[in-house]
Amino acid sequence: MIKKEKNLFDLLSEKPWDQEQSAQDNLHSGKTINLTKAHLGLRGIMTVSIIFFSLFIVTYADRMLLHDWQKMPEPKLLWFNTFVLFLSSILFHRAKNRSDLQEFKEVKNLLLIIGFFAIIFFIGQSIAWKQLMEQGYFFNSNIANSYFYLFTTLHVLHLFGGLFFLKRITQNIFDRNSKLLTMQSGVKLCGIYWHFLFLVWLVLFGLMINS
């Protein structure tokens, strides 16, 4: 029996809970969605984060048009932090490729370096906050300052969560009893999240230095 191809309208109008629909699905020749709980969880986290940051960006863009907006100086250290995230993203891309080749000895070293870079970013961000406060730019002194501290703090919290999962993945790789697919999937997913955080930082950083 020749299986039927489904178009977009068919997919949107189908009723998978109906018995007749179930019989029709058996004739479907397309690929089914096969995502692990980790994949679905990551997609959920990224979706919520995108919505969350987008709402703040919209309010930021509206608020900066008012007369009481006072632009604050951007610490030069933020450029260094951006470079650190850029290097981390490159290293994660290499770690993913080495993981696919099952070269986990190099993957271990790369993940340790990435974790070290994350700590460097945290330290750099703390120093940047300290420099601004020493100059009198406190959280509640101006609305622009409030948004800066809010954006950077939210990003740090997201990166801290990424560092937690990076720690778990690194432990799995050092554990010789871990399954191959588990290790490869962990490196891939954590890498995707790291790239996502880098892109979010670029958007936030670009917005802050141009407003």
How should each PLM-predicted stretch be described?
Residues 1-211:
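...captures the hydrophobic TM-helix bundle architecture rather than a specific catalytic motif
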